[in-house]
Amino acid sequence: MVNAILSKKKKLVADGVFYAELNEFFTRELAEQGYAGVEVRKTPSKLEVIVKASNTQGVLGEQGRRIHELTSLIVKRFKLSPEGIAIYAERVEERGLSAAVQAEALKAKLLSGLPIRRAAYGVLRFAMGAGAKGVEVVISGKLRAARAKSQKYADGFMIHSGQPTRDFIDIAIRHVLMRQGVLGIKVKIMKDPAANRFGPRALPDAVKIAEAKDEDEVIPAPTVKSYKQTAEDETETDAPVEAEAEVEATA
């Protein structure tokens, strides 16, 4: 039993190390193609690696040459059989809600010489326009002076703790080598809980208040007293009719 538990732990650690190295490899190789993450699926026949990027054509390359090069490098690094692994490219549908894509876009803007404030606000506007609930961009390093500091740009609503941070917030960290030194980029995007496809669709403290119904006239419940009153009213209304009938008969 102990050996079985240890083997499970070793397998989990090995899978985690494999995923971390694979993610680091694709982050380094596919930075220009808008790399946004990787998904590993194990099937009985082969290992499927799904690469998510904004530019899938750049991942595939001309006549599939680039993806074959990536496959050969992974096979050589992890000592896998060429027939036992398959790499697929998947396009990121919502680029504005992917923190990795926006971090790479911000990195490209900084390398092109765009001012830091203008580049950061461009990311904020693009993400909020795509339907994000909140966006936060932090850039740290030697921004203007010789002393390093950090600047934070935020828009919308953002949470910082608890399980909802795992459910609704996407985080990406990148580093860019500038002339004055290395700058750190951190992008946090909070997705709209109502548009969440998988998992909860609302925050834990969200309260839904039902709309008030129209106030109709309330009819009181009948009682014994009301029945008696109704009977007396009926006898009073019937008495004059009987008297008129007797007068007509005598005439």
UniProtKB/Swiss-Prot annotation:
Pfam annotation, one family: Ribosomal_S3_C
Subcellular location: Cytoplasm
Family: Belongs to the universal ribosomal protein uS3 family.
A single cellular component GO annotation: hyphal cell wall
PROSITE patterns: KH_TYPE_2
Main location: cytoplasm
Keyword Glycosyltransferase: no
Function of the protein: Component of the ribosome, a large ribonucleoprotein complex responsible for the synthesis of proteins in the cell. The small ribosomal subunit (SSU) binds messenger RNAs (mRNAs) and translates the encoded message by selecting cognate aminoacyl-transfer RNA (tRNA) molecules. The large subunit (LSU) contains the ribosomal catalytic site termed the peptidyl transferase center (PTC), which catalyzes the formation of peptide bonds, thereby polymerizing the amino acids delivered by tRNAs into a polypeptide chain.
Complexes and interactors: Component of the small ribosomal subunit. Mature ribosomes consist of a small (40S) and a large (60S) subunit. The 40S subunit contains about 32 different proteins and 1 molecule of RNA (18S). The 60S subunit contains 45 different proteins and 3 molecules of RNA (25S, 5.8S and 5S).
UniProt-listed GO biological process terms: cytoplasmic translation; maintenance of translational fidelity; nonfunctional rRNA decay; ribosomal small subunit export from nucleus
Protein name: Small ribosomal subunit protein uS3
Gene that specifies this protein: RPS3
Domain KH type-2: 22-93
Species per Swiss-Prot/TrEMBL record: Candida albicans (strain SC5314 / ATCC MYA-2876)
GO terms, molecular function: DNA-(apurinic or apyrimidinic site) endonuclease activity; RNA binding; structural constituent of ribosome
Stored NCBIfam families: PRK04191.1 (NF003219), uS3_euk_arch (TIGR01008)
